[in-house]
């Protein structure tokens, strides 16, 4: 699907920079933490049939405990200083929407390994019970970036206590 000029411009305005072929894709912060908290609150009674109350309480706190919301500005600046070609603060539509938006806005193709995406076990288990795709859940607090030398940047983020991983790479196709 090709976007019209105005739609493409609006999409590009959401993203800082543009992905370049050969960029490594990095996710900082566990995806779907915000969405997990929301569905846990809204489906609490159903989830109590499967999980202990303590587990559900912890799931509600995921964004504040593991999310990057309070560190977003720090991560944003670190990415800029490390030469990131593009940065995007995830939100509605989750991780998969973020991937599509960045690729479409940048005119590149990409490959991603879902097994590498930082995600909490609580999210996986709750989504499995509710038959929800965790990669489409609200992911506020997580950041998707494109950068050359992604492994070094991920190590830098991890030293700061931030959950992060190289999850894929861009190419010239789209």
List the predicted regions and their residue ranges.
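Helix-biased detector of long, well-ordered alpha-helical tracts
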Residues: 1-174
């Amino acid at each position: 699907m090709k976007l019209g000029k105005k739609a493409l411009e609006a999409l590009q305005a959401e993203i800082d920079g543009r992905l370049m072929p050969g960029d490594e894709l990095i996710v900082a912060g566990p995806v779907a933490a915000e969405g997990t908290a929301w569905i846990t609150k809204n489906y609490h009674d159903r989830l109590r049939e499967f999980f202990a109350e303590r587990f559900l309480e912890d799931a509600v706190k995921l964004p504040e405990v593991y999310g990057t919301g309070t560190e977003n500005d720090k991560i944003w600046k670190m990415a800029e200083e490390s030469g990131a070609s593009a940065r995007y603060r995830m939100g509605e539509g989750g991780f998969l929407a973020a991937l599509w938006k960045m690729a479409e806005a940048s005119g590149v193709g990409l490959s991603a390994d879902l097994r590498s995406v930082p995600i909490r076990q609580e999210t996986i288990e709750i989504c499995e019970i509710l038959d929800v795709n965790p990669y489409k859940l609200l992911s506020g607090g997580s950041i998707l970036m494109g950068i050359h030398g992604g492994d070094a940047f991920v190590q830098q983020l991890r030293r700061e206590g931030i959950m992060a991983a190289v999850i894929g790479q861009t190419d010239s196709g789209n």
